[in-house]
């Protein structure tokens, strides 16, 4: 039998304190479903790598929102650094991760 190795998903505190507060209830539910079904299962398969200056990060599209995360294959973990509307996600995340 094939055993699936699940990834652990972690959130930067700012995602909980800022990002999720501005997202509507229905969109939050869709985001949670996508995290549970895709990021915890095969984040490499369902996401795309980003280009510079966010080259070490990946994105998962959930409707009009983007989940930006760092993938740690060795430890089977995803660190979500931002969840925002597609119009402003990259500038906001750039401020958080590039210092």
Range-by-range predicted roles:
Residues 1-33:
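Arg/Lys-rich, positively charged N-terminal/basic patches that mediate binding to nucleic acids
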